[in-house]
Swiss-Prot record:
PANTHER family, A to Z: 30S RIBOSOMAL PROTEIN S16, SMALL RIBOSOMAL SUBUNIT PROTEIN BS16M
Protein name (Swiss-Prot/TrEMBL): Small ribosomal subunit protein bS16
One of the GO BP terms on file: translation
Source taxonomy: Bacteria, Bacillati, Chloroflexota, Chloroflexia, Chloroflexales
Molecular function via GO: structural constituent of ribosome
Gene that produces this protein: rpsP
Family the entry assigns: Belongs to the bacterial ribosomal protein bS16 family.
Entry-linked Gene3D superfamilies: 3.30.1320.10
InterPro entries according to UniProt: Ribosomal_bS16, Ribosomal_bS16_dom_sf
Length: 89
């Protein structure tokens, strides 16, 4: 199964995350298929950048986002409150 999840990068105690598409059997920071964005929670304000076209593509072909990624995708209006993909505007 293909998942959309966070891959931790950055220094100790200064995490940053890449939003990646990966096989669910791969380790958290291991092999991945594609990077579709990044999230910097330590910056003020927090920085979130997502390639909406690629995120919609992967969701359309059946990739399952993790719970945290669902919240992030809702924040950038790729998913609606029910978790369904929002049409491109």
């Amino acid at each position: 199964m293909v998942k959309i999840r966070l891959r931790r990068t950055g220094k100790t105690k200064q995490p940053s995350y890449r939003i990646v598409v990966a096989d669910s059997r791969s380790p958290r920071d291991g092999k991945f298929i594609e990077t579709i964005g990044y999230y910097l929670p330590t910056r003020q304000p927090k920085v979130l950048e997502v390639n909406a076209d690629r995120a919609r593509y992967w969701l359309g072909v059946g990739a399952q986002p993790t719970d945290v990624v669902v919240k992030l995708l809702k924040r950038v209006n790729i998913l609606d409150e029910q978790g369904k993909v929002v049409a491109e505007s």
